Amino acid sequence: MLITLEGIDGAGKSTLYEGLKTRLQDLEPVFTKEPGSPLVNSAVRREIGANRDPFAEATLFVADHAAHLAQVVLPALEEKKLVISDRYSDSRFAYQQVSLIGIVPDPKAWLTAVHAGWSVRPDLTILLLISPETAMNRLHERPGKEHFEDPAFLEEVQKKYLERVTEDPERFLLIDAAQEPETILDFVEKSIRALPRQ
């Protein structure tokens, strides 16, 4: 079973991810994240920090996803393990669909085409929803800054996430990320434990 954690920067994905690592040890899940492939991840981070090209950045994220699937996700799923990933393909359909506007004619169609036939659909996606203003307040407390951290940009990204929900509603569990982290963790843990095991 593949479970993914999604949401805009500052929504609390990493906090939830780390909490689940502690809470779900008895299930022996494989915890992973994107970007995660060591070689591609370093290139992605360089691109984010440099004079970036959104198309090059998007292709690097797709390459990382391919490596992540081949090296981590598919082997674990073949062994019938529970896989929990901090970010996955929905991040591309949210972030890159916005960043590629004006660069490719139809960002959604391009992203759909490059993922078609090989990317694996998650069994459950936990989407943390929060106002961009609250997310920005949280991000300002973090060291470092990435170009994605802009309230107008984050608002558009969250809209793209919600479009994904409309297209595949049965896959998503929506969470109000303005709640206390422990409240969110309790609810998500119970939700995961209630899932039928494959």
From Swiss-Prot:
It holds the Pfam family Thymidylate_kin. It comes from the Archaea. The keyword Cell inner membrane does not apply. The keyword Ion transport does not apply. One of its GO terms (biological process) is dTTP biosynthetic process. GO terms for molecular function: ATP binding; dTMP kinase activity. Its EC number is 2.7.4.9. GO terms for cellular component: cytoplasm. Belongs to the thymidylate kinase family. This is Probable thymidylate kinase. It comes from Methanocorpusculum labreanum (strain ATCC 43576 / DSM 4855 / Z).
